[in-house]
Amino acid sequence: MHKTIYLVTDDAKMDFDTLYHKVEMALDGGVKLLQLREKKSSSREFYNNALKMKYLCKKYDIPLIINDRVDIAQAVDADGVHLGQSDLPLTVARKILGPEKIIGISARTVEDAMLAEKNNADYLGVGAVFPTSTKNDAKVISEKVFHDIQAKVSIPIVTIGGITLNNASTLINRGVNCIAVVSAILNQDNPKEAAIYLNNLFK
């Protein structure tokens, strides 16, 4: 997961057809990972939307990660799942999905991060690194905690939370290799241009 833009969707912001169109533009701009997060949808809607996104991701040859729902990830044969601390335990998700699937874990403390690595998580989602309006319960972690996590684990770290076109370079200058964004791409009139801009920051 080297120098990558990771796009996370938000079904609270727009209808699925609009989202699909914006995601396609973002993938065209070089987004390399997509996480489908559906907090409002029924299981049937989530499943149908995940299938559509899977075909889109296949077209661009990038992984589709499902937020929270191991059952949906399994049902559509997605590339992986991203789990929070209150979701199904990583070890259980691994038994269900198998060794080949990507499993990411949200971590806000060094202890969470080390346990996730011990249990063979593929990457960590660490944040929020800035205040964010996308997740109301997201608390900002200190730069010290972030660096402590970096120092203690060797698996890839994805930074998330409040990352915008204006502050992304601050993180990249700190040596961050992967940033996860929502609004920074999906709220733009031209998601492709936003994705290109973020990718260029790594250069």
Regions picked out by a protein language model, each given a short descriptive name:
Residues 1-88, 95-123, 141, 148, ...:
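Conserved N-terminal beta1-alpha1 strand-loop-helix module at the mouth
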Residues 38, 128-130:
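Short, histidine-centered active-site or binding-site loop motifs used for metal coordination
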Residues 73, 130-136:
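A short acidic, helix-capping loop that chelates divalent metal ions and anchors anionic groups
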Residues 88-89, 132:
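A short, polar/charged loop-to-alpha-helix boundary motif
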Residues 120, 174-177:
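As written
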Residues 161-162, 175:
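A short glycine-leucine-enriched loop at secondary-structure breakpoints
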Residues 177-184:
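Short, electropositive alpha-helical surface patch
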